[in-house]
Amino acid sequence: MDYIILDIEFNGRKFASDLPMEVIEIGAVRLNEQLQLIDQFSALIKPVYFAKLNKFIQKKTGILQTEIDEAERFPKVINDFQQWLAQSESCLFITWGGEDMKRIVLDTRMHRLDDQYFLHADYFDLLKGFIKHKGLVNDISVENALVELQIEADGHAHRALDDARMTSEIFKATFEHLDFSQIQQYKDSFTNAKERRLIKNAIRLLLSQKLEPTWPMFEEHFLQKTIKTDNPKKTAEIKQYFLEQMTKQKNDKTTD
C-alpha cells in the first residue's frame, strides 16, 4: 500500500460571500510501504469564482495571477489527479486536518462530477495523530510541528506540493507512534466549528441556570437567533449534535 500525502490551497476571501471557495492548487507526494518518496503531483487550478486572486492569497501562497490565468479548470486537474492516484494498487491518504478532503469533495460536487472516489477514500488525519502522540491540547501548524520534531523546513509554506513534502517528513518521523485505528472517510458536515461551539456553550449556560436543556427550548431561545438553518440536513445535524452534547454534559455534571 502507498501513502498519499495530500495538501490543497484554496481561494480564501477577506470578506464573507455566498459564493463558494474553490481549490486553486493540489499537491501530493506518494510514499511506498518503506516510506520512500517515489512520486509527486502538482497542479494549479483556475477558479470559476473569484478568478482574480486577492492580495492576501497572493502574498500567503506566492501564486502569481498569471499562473492562475494559465491554469486548467478543476475538472481537468481532478481527472489528471485521479489518473495519477490510480498508479497505486491501494493507497491511504494522509492529510493535516480534515479540510483537504472536504474541499475536494465540495469542488467535485460544484462541478457536477462523480464524488464517489473521494467519499470512499480512506484517510488519516495526521494533525490529530500528532496531537495525540505529543499530548498537545491545541492544533499546531505543519511548520511548528517540524520545529517540535527538530526537522528543518524545506520549501515554501502554503504552496501545496511543498506543504505535502513537509507533511511527509512529519509522517515519517512519527509513523511508529501513530494510531492507525483512527483511519476515516469523509463525512458530510453541515455545521462548522463555531456553530458547534455555540451549541455546547448554550447547553452549558442552561445547565448553570439549573434549567433542563430541551430541544424546543434551545430552538426557540438560541437556534433561531444565532445559526442560519435554511437547510433541513443542517437542522437535523444540529439537533443530533445538541442531543449528544446535552447527554454528555449532563453525565459530566453528574460525575463531578
Regions found by a protein language model. Name each.
Residues 63-67:
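Short glycine/proline- and acidic residue-enriched helix-loop micro-motifs
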